[in-house]
């Protein structure tokens, strides 16, 4: 009886440690986990449209990263800053599909914003929370995201 309790307790501890920390066990190798989503930085330079297409080919449900909070931006910066130094990365926000309304490529509502001008396609600095509009034909690095 004592062994059963010990083994059961041990399994419970392992389960809670994996599920409680978001240890990334749901994300494929090379992807990082945050709040139930998987993220990956790609160093290739691409146009916005090519970057979105590239992300959709990386994993089912994947798109250019959508940023829903300041905390999520901090997480993405923690990934991009060491890899890309002072670079710019495409995010999944543009008005390329609808001339007057900004939309995330994954269909999420635009709740969190970090720029002041009406953009065409949006890049984020790899080292801070600033967003900039850029012509969609320019090339930048890529961050992809999907729900785990």
UniProtKB/Swiss-Prot annotation:
Sequence similarity: Belongs to the snaclec family.
Keyword Cell inner membrane in record: no
Subunit details: Heterodimer; disulfide-linked.
Note: Shows greater sequence similarity to the beta than alpha subunits compared to other heterodimer snaclecs.
UniProt source species: Crotalus durissus terrificus (South American rattlesnake)
Lineage: Eukaryota, Metazoa, Chordata, Craniata, Vertebrata
The protein, known as: Snaclec crotocetin
Location in the cell: Secreted
Disulfide bonds, paired cysteine numbers: 27-38, 55-144, 121-136
């Amino acid at each position: 009886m004592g062994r059963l309790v010990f083994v059961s307790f041990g399994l419970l501890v392992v389960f809670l440690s994996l599920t409680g920390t978001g240890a990334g066990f749901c994300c494929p190798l090379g992807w990082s986990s945050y709040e139930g989503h998987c993220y990956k930085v790609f160093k290739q330079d691409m146009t916005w449209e090519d970057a979105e297409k590239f992300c959709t080919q990386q994993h089912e449900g994947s798109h250019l990263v959508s940023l829903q909070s300041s905390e999520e931006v901090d997480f993405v910066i923690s990934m991009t800053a060491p890899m890309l130094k002072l670079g710019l990365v495409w995010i999944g926000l543009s008005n390329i599909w609808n001339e007057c309304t900004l939309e995330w490529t994954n269909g999420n509502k635009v709740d969190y914003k970090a720029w002041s001008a009406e953009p065409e396609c949006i890049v984020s600095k790899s080292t801070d929370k600033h967003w900039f509009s850029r012509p969609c034909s320019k090339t930048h690095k890529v961050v992809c995201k999907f729900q785990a």
